[in-house]
Amino acid sequence: MNCLNAARLPFSEFSFTNLYLFRDVHDYYISGTECRILIDGITRDHVHYAMPLFDISLIGGEELEKIIRDNGVLFPVHESQLHLFSPDKYEWSYSHDDSDYLFTRDKLIHYPGRNLHKKRNLLKQFLEGYEWRSEPLTSERSADAQKILSDWQKGTGLADSETDYLSCHEALNHIESFNLTGCVIYVEDALAGFVLGEMISPNVFALHFAKCNTRFKGIYQFIYNHYAKELSPECEWINFEQDLGIPALRQAKETYEPDMMAHKYRVKLKD
């Protein structure tokens, strides 16, 4: 289990990889004590917060209040933890932009039901239309993934700083150091796509990056399905992370019909 996730929450923030890759975006730094480590940061909408790397249910109310008083906001707080905060003293809210999309591994393996019929069709078209092979994404194949990433970035028509290109590029340079896993897909020896992520709790896999060449019809539906099958049966959930309020990203994630939205509450003292 990721040692950052003492409370075993499904949030993608509880990952050294994400903390490191987005350190400049959120201006992260470590505070607190040895037994009560906090990550201080700034949200994308410029709110200062503290993220506890310990189970907040194990500390007293006075200590919890002091942390919030000293830092302004506690984030992310899971819905199951809200009972720790009196509505007379605290207020809380969440932004959909921050919420993680979680899917059962079984859903991505089977794409069940009428609403996922198009996903099944696209998967079938890929399997019937292409000769493919999958290889583990290790440092030896990082260059191939970097080429897929570079081509994907060019296809967006955006600057490197306007997408997750830079963070993905850095992750591909540190696959083993960050204990990341994934696969690269080849279609008739052409580079088709890759996924990269990590286990963030005993039963949750965080899918940090998925980049594909869409000239191969059905590649995204295939790669999600394929890698879900590759994961250990102990992995029950796959976290597609947040959409950051980007309409196209939100629409793409919603089409897979998430089984759970992990809302990340911000808790603060009332004025």
Where would I find each of the regions flagged by the language model?
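Conserved donor-binding loop and adjoining core beta-sheet/short helix segment
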Residues: S12-Q81, Y186-T214
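Acyltransferase donor/substrate-recognition loop-hinge adjacent to the catalytic core
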Residues: K89-L158
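Short, polar loop motifs at secondary-structure junctions
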Residues: V77-H83, N121-L123, L244-G245
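A structural signal for short, well-ordered beta-strand segments and their strand-loop junctions
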Residues: G72-E79, L102, S134-L137, V184, ...
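Aromatic (often tryptophan-rich) hydrophobic motifs at membrane interfaces
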Residues: G182-K270
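A mid-sequence, solvent-exposed acidic-amphipathic segment
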Residues: A143, K147-H208
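Short, aromatic/basic amphipathic alpha-helical patches
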Residues: H83-E91, A252-K253
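Short Lys/Arg-enriched alpha/beta "domain-start" segment
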Residues: M1-N5, F11-F16
